[in-house]
Amino acid sequence: MADVVVGIQWGDEGKGKIVDRIAKDYDFVVRYQGGHNAGHTIVHKGVKHSLHLMPSGVLYPKCKNIISSAVVVSVKDLCEEISAFEDLENRLFVSDRAHVILPYHAKKDAFKEKSQNIGTTKKGIGPCYEDKMARSGIRMGDLLDDKILEEKLNAHFKAIEPFKKAYDLGENYEKDLMGYFKTYAPKICPFIKDTTSMLIEANQKGEKILLEGAQGTLLDIDLGTYPFVTSSNTTSASACVSTGLNPKAINEVIGITKAYSTRVGNGPFPSEDTTPMGDHLRTKGAEFGTTTKRPRRCGWLDLVALKYACALNGCTQLALMKLDVLDGIDAIKVCVAYERKGERLEIFPSDLKDCVPIYQTFKGWEKSVGVRKLDDLEPNVREYIRFIEKEVGVKIRLISTSPEREDTIFL
């Protein structure tokens, strides 16, 4: 059976810590979408690990880690991540169906961002998915056969010839890309496998599989705040499509949310706080992107968005992250509805334009940091937790009270 960990906000919810905390109980940890535009930060024994492509189970020696078919892979960045770990043989597997991000994709991404102003990371994620959908992409499995790779690259060179100048690819792009693959392909090829068959077999054997998403539900290409979204499907349903596991294999869906809200880049954010309180949340919560180091926009918990995300994913339980960031705040707001042109909205709309948050205010608390038992939390904290559970209709089973792995309350 497989369990899914999915972010139910705009990403950066703390999925990495949760996966790291529970990965020891699983045989496989699988990253199922996105690329190196995402980032997980894990603190283990006082050491901070920043992961962008690697599944969060790499810190457990007995855990097998898979990068599945819907992930887009920068071979250079993956090689750099691999070099930071030891003994990954037979512990890391990259799907032969996953698509390869080329330097061209990053150049195209940066070029398009100038006019679209979406707030992308300019890592080439979107353009790589574009080529995938156009059936012209290069897959990881192509790296295993020099002849096939050469054919794919020649087709790529022909296709991009009219755009070389616009995307500033340089006169030696073809030669440089050939050298790029000669450098990195030998390092990555030993990890390329048919991971779909591996996971189907593992599920049939009854092995435990944890499926790890990147970004968050509200960034889903179809169901998020379009066009300010990522280029992949980020909900739990996409875990099946990417891995080859059928829906019957899914057991628990664990939705991850912060005790407040954040967003990176442009796009609507009804509960954003642009006062000094937003700055306080950013500073105390260290809200700066793992990948881009960009400051995250911060605000209050949005229950309209949270209920929507829980429904989309079929969440069976929640993990509440960064509760300690709210310590010491006298009055804590929660968005319970929107108002738009005089109308009260309690259902998340497809367009958030003109939506103004309607807040309910709670009394704050002094300290929750480092607490590991529910009974040790102050009454006002417990009231806040109960209210979230009641409004969303899903039980909170895990609460994080600091970045440390051990500072976690299990319910």
Swiss-Prot record:
It is found in: Cytoplasm. Substrate binds at T290, T291, T292, K293, R294, P295, R296. Pathway: Purine metabolism; AMP biosynthesis via de novo pathway; AMP from IMP: step 1/2. Disulfide bonds: none annotated. Its EC number is 6.3.4.4. Mg(2+) binds at D12, G39. Binds 1 Mg(2+) ion per subunit. IMP binds at D12, E13, G14, K15, N37, A38, G39, H40, T121, R135, Q215, T230, R294. Its cofactor is Mg(2+). One of its GO terms (molecular function) is adenylosuccinate synthase activity. GO terms for biological process: 'de novo' AMP biosynthetic process; IMP metabolic process. GTP binds at residues 11-17, 39-41, 296, 322-324, 400-402. InterPro entries: Adenylosuccin_syn_GTP-bd (IPR018220), Adenylosuccin_syn_Lys_AS (IPR033128), Adenylosuccinate_synth_dom1 (IPR042109), Adenylosuccinate_synth_dom2 (IPR042110), Adenylosuccinate_synth_dom3 (IPR042111), Adenylosuccinate_synthetase (IPR001114), P-loop_NTPase (IPR027417). Keywords: Cytoplasm, GTP-binding, Ligase, Magnesium, Metal-binding, Nucleotide-binding, Purine biosynthesis. It catalyses: IMP + L-aspartate + GTP = N(6)-(1,2-dicarboxyethyl)-AMP + GDP + phosphate + 2 H(+). GO terms for cellular component: cytoplasm. The active site is at D12 (proton acceptor), H40 (proton donor). Homodimer. Belongs to the adenylosuccinate synthetase family. Plays an important role in the de novo pathway of purine nucleotide biosynthesis. Catalyzes the first committed step in the biosynthesis of AMP from IMP. This is Adenylosuccinate synthetase. It comes from Helicobacter pylori (strain ATCC 700392 / 26695). The gene is purA.
